[in-house]
Amino acid sequence: MIKNPKVLILTAHYGNGHVQVAKTLEQAFHQKGIEDVIVCDLFGESHPVITDITKYLYLKSYTIGKELYRLFYYGVEKIYDKKIASWYANFGRKRLKALLHTEKPDIVINTFPIIAVPELKKQTGFSIPVYNVLTDFCLHKIWIHREVDRYFVATDHVKQVMIEIGVPAERIVETGIPIRKNFELTMNSELIYNKYQLSREKKILLIVAGAHGVLGNVKDLCASFMSVPNLQVAVVCGKNDALKQELLKLQEQNSEALKVFGYIENIDELFRVTSCMITKPGGITLSEAAALQVPVILYKPVPGQENENAIYFESKGAAVVIREDAEIFEKTKALLEDDRKLLQMKEAMGSIYRPEPAAHIVDVILEENHAQTNHVPMKSPALAQSFT
C-alpha cells in the first residue's frame, strides 16, 4: 500500500480548460487526503517561446486561422503515427526527466495530450502508472499510447471509438470530464436572481463572450436581442475589458434588457438561471452546461475538437449549432419561444452528464495504486503512441 502518494499532473495553457481540469483533479485528491499534488505546465516550462507562439496561433484559430487549424487537427490525425510522433514525443522531455528525478512522483496524470511520459516509460522501462484524462467529447489519436495505463473519457461514444482503433476496453473508464465542484452543488435560485438583478418572470439568454474575442459581433447581437420582449440578455466578457466597456455603453440604453459582466468566478450561478446559452463548444464548458442541464447554442465551432464536440451534442439533441452569422438571431429567438424544445434539450443535457467525474477518476487511480487515504469533508463554496 502506498501511503501519501505523490501525484504529478501535467497540463498546458491552450485555452483554460486543460488547466482547469488539472486543478479540479488536484482539489479532488486533496479531498481524499492526498496533499502532495504537483500541477505542471510541461510545455510552457520547457519551451516558453515556442509555447507562446503556438498559444497565439491557437487563439487566432477562432478568427483568421480556421483553415490552418483544420489542416493541423485533421492532418496530424492522419499522419501522426508516421511523422509527428517522434518529434512530439520528445517535446518537453528534458524538463520531464528533471521533474521525475527531483519530485519522484508515484502517479502521473495528463490533462493535455502529452506523450513524453509514456514514451519515456517505453524507452527507459521505468515503472510509473500513467493516466490520460481526455477533455473533449471526441478522440484525437495523439492521446493514445501503449504505455498509458488508463484513459478516462467523457462518454461511451469516445470509449467505443478507442476500442475500434485497438485500445483494450479494460483500459478505458467512462467518467465524464472533471468540472468545478460549484457545478455539482444545489443553490437557491432566488439569491442568484437578486444578486445579478435578473427577473424570474423573463427568459434569460446567457452569452459567454470570453476573453479572447472568440464570439464575433457581440455588440450587434446584444442590440438585436434587446428588442425582444420579455427577454433579458446576460453577457459575460471574461477578462476582455475592451468588450465590457463597449457593451456597458449599450447597456445604458436599456439596463433592464441587457446585463454586462466581466470575469465571474462563480459563473455556475448564471448557468442555473439561464434559459439557454450561446457559447463555444469547448469540452469543459459543455460538461458544465450538461451538469446544470443548460440548453446551448454553439456558435461557429472551429474545425477540430470544437466542431466534433458540437456535432456530438447536436446529434444528442442537446445543442443547436450555428455556422453562419445571419442565422444566429432568428434561430436563437425561435428556440427561446419554443418551451417544448428547450425542455427536450435540458433532458438531453441531463442524459450526457456523468456525476462527480473528478471524484470517480481519483477513486479509480487510488484504488489501482492501493493508496492509503484520509477523507477530508468538503465545505460548500459560498454563493458569490498507437495500438494500430
Curated annotation (Swiss-Prot):
Molecular-function GO term, any one:
1,2-diacylglycerol 3-glucosyltransferase activity
Q: Which domain of life is it from?
A: Bacteria
Can the keyword Cell membrane be found in this entry's annotation? Answer: yes
One Pfam family cited in the UniProt record for this chain: Glyco_tran_28_C
A Gene Ontology annotation in the biological process aspect, one of them, is: glycolipid biosynthetic process
Q: Which PANTHER family match?
A: MONOGALACTOSYLDIACYLGLYCEROL SYNTHASE, MONOGALACTOSYLDIACYLGLYCEROL SYNTHASE 1, CHLOROPLASTIC
Q: Which reaction does it catalyse?
A: a 1,2-diacyl-3-O-(beta-D-glucopyranosyl)-sn-glycerol + UDP-alpha-D-glucose = a 1,2-diacyl-3-O-(beta-D-Glc-(1->6)-beta-D-Glc)-sn-glycerol + UDP + H(+); a 1,2-diacyl-3-O-(beta-D-Glc-(1->6)-beta-D-Glc)-sn-glycerol + UDP-alpha-D-glucose = a 1,2-diacyl-3-O-(beta-D-Glc-(1->6)-beta-D-Glc-(1->6)-beta-D-Glc)-sn-glycerol + UDP + H(+); a 1,2-diacyl-sn-glycerol + UDP-alpha-D-glucose = a 1,2-diacyl-3-O-(beta-D-glucopyranosyl)-sn-glycerol + UDP + H(+)
EC number(s) on file:
2.4.1.315
Give the UniProt keywords, A-Z: Carbohydrate metabolism, Cell membrane, Glycosyltransferase, Lipid biosynthesis, Lipid metabolism, Membrane, Transferase
* Alphabetical list of InterPro entries matching this protein: Diacylglyc_glucosyltr_N (IPR009695), Glyco_trans_28_C (IPR007235), Glycosyltransf_28_UgtP (IPR050519), Pro_diacylglycrl_glcsylTrfase (IPR023589)
Enzyme class, broadest EC rank = transferase
Q: Where in the cell is it found?
A: Cell membrane
Protein name as catalogued: Processive diacylglycerol beta-glucosyltransferase
Record keyword Cell membrane present: yes
Task: Tell me, in one coarse class, where this protein mainly resides.
Answer: membrane
User: Which family does the UniProt entry place this protein in?
Assistant: Belongs to the glycosyltransferase 28 family. UgtP subfamily.
Q: What does this protein do?
A: Processive glucosyltransferase involved in the biosynthesis of both the bilayer- and non-bilayer-forming membrane glucolipids. Is able to successively transfer up to three glucosyl residues to diacylglycerol (DAG), thereby catalyzing the formation of beta-monoglucosyl-DAG (3-O-(beta-D-glucopyranosyl)-1,2-diacyl-sn-glycerol), beta-diglucosyl-DAG (3-O-(beta-D-glucopyranosyl-beta-(1->6)-D-glucopyranosyl)-1,2-diacyl-sn-glycerol) and beta-triglucosyl-DAG (3-O-(beta-D-glucopyranosyl-beta-(1->6)-D-glucopyranosyl-beta-(1->6)-D-glucopyranosyl)-1,2-diacyl-sn-glycerol).
CC per GO annotation: plasma membrane
Q: Quick one: which pathway?
A: Glycolipid metabolism; diglucosyl-diacylglycerol biosynthesis
